[in-house]
Structure formats: C-alpha cells, structure tokens
Amino acid sequence: MRLYQLSSQSLQFPDPNHALDDPNGLLAVGGDLSVARLKAAYRQGIFPWFSPGEPILWWSPNPRAVLFPDELHVSRSMKKFLKRHTFHATLNQAFDDVIHACAHEHHDGTWITSEIISAYRQLHLAGKAHSVEVWQDDKLVGGLYGVEQGRLFCGESMFSRTDNASKYALLAFQQHFIHHGGHLIDCQVLNAHTASLGVSEIPRDRFLQQLSQWQDLAVDDGCWLPQQLAEPTL
C-alpha cells in the first residue's frame, strides 16, 4: 500500500480499501477542504483529520466505529440523571458555537483547526453539516456536530461543559434521527467514551456497504430544520 497524493484538478479519491494499515486508515494527502471535495470524500467513507502544521490528511480506518441507533446503551446512572436533569436540546441553532466549543475542548492537540472550522461552516451553509446543542439556563453546555449522508450520519466531534451534556446530546439526537428514518451513526474511531454509549466496531467493507445502502435514501421531511428536540425517552 502507498499514500496517495490528491490532485488539485480532480475530486477523485482512491479506493478506501487501499488505505494504510499503519497508521490505520491513512489514505491520501493534499487537495483542499472545499464543499465539493468534502462531499466527494464522505460519499466514499473518507474524512479529513490532521493537526496544525500538517498537510491535509484523509482517512478511512479499518475497523470503523459505528452506532446502530437502536443499540445505544444508557447506563443506570444516566437513567437516573434523565429523571432530574435541567437540559434541553436543539438542532442547528448554533453550529458555529458548537464547532468552536469542540475545538476548544481538544485544544491541547486539536485536529479542529481554523481550516476545519471554516470548511465545515461552509458545509453547514450548504445543508450537509449539522449541530446539536444542549442548553442549561440558556447557556450552551454541550453538543455535537457531523455530516449527513442520507439515512446515515457521520459524527465528527462532541463537547461537554458539564456532566452528561454530550451524552444527552447524543441521546436526543439518536431519538430524533430514528424518528425521521435514520439508520446508522458513524463514529469513525472507537474510544472509551463512545464505547460506553454502545458504539462498536465493524469491518470497513461492511461500513462501506452500509454507506452505499443508506446514503442515497432521504430521511423524512423536517429532520434537519432548526428546532427543539424532544426529551429522550427510555
């Protein structure tokens, strides 16, 4: 396997199955973060991930971390929390605030650079990137953002300024997504936090099959309109 150099004259990506094993999933370098290129990348299960000072790096890891929405795990402590919380969640009400908060949360080694923020803001304005906000006393305390691919949602990052806020964002979103016909949430790479929520790993080829199956099927009307999300029910 070799690392591919993207052409500035073409939006074409190499086959994700040609990604390197070490580092896991690294596929290509270069190109840009235009809306057109990001759309082309997500259609093939590829996403950008790089640190300040690095060139743009494109990834498609194997295995892939995913959440089948009906397999979301809610811990006993979270169930107790949901009975007494003071949160409410919204959709697409404060995208810029959410992505900046995600960048700040990971400031010690963030991959959410100013380039990424600008690119995903344009993707949001194009109707492809979306945010979930969690509020407490009218203050933004948690949230997440990602990219929709039909009935599949590619989660990018989440943040929490108080206990359980990011978990609440995911709970409220997955309920909303299922209600509107969503089938799969892509979490890219497994970590301890997402594993505790029921995220699991599947082989890349199975993920790509799921992507092909769901990305050209639309969710129900109204799914991505700015709105308040319903309380999570268990």
From Swiss-Prot:
Entry keyword Acyltransferase: yes
Main location: cytoplasm
Gene Ontology molecular functions: leucyl-tRNA--protein transferase activity
Record-annotated membrane-spanning stretches: none
Gene3D superfamilies the record matches: Leucyl/phenylalanyl-tRNA-protein transferase, C-terminal domain (3.40.630.70), Leucyl/phenylalanyl-tRNA-protein transferase, N-terminal domain (3.30.70.3550)
Catalytic activity: N-terminal L-lysyl-[protein] + L-leucyl-tRNA(Leu) = N-terminal L-leucyl-L-lysyl-[protein] + tRNA(Leu) + H(+); N-terminal L-arginyl-[protein] + L-leucyl-tRNA(Leu) = N-terminal L-leucyl-L-arginyl-[protein] + tRNA(Leu) + H(+); L-phenylalanyl-tRNA(Phe) + an N-terminal L-alpha-aminoacyl-[protein] = an N-terminal L-phenylalanyl-L-alpha-aminoacyl-[protein] + tRNA(Phe)
The protein's name: Leucyl/phenylalanyl-tRNA--protein transferase
Source organism of this protein record: Pectobacterium carotovorum subsp. carotovorum (strain PC1)
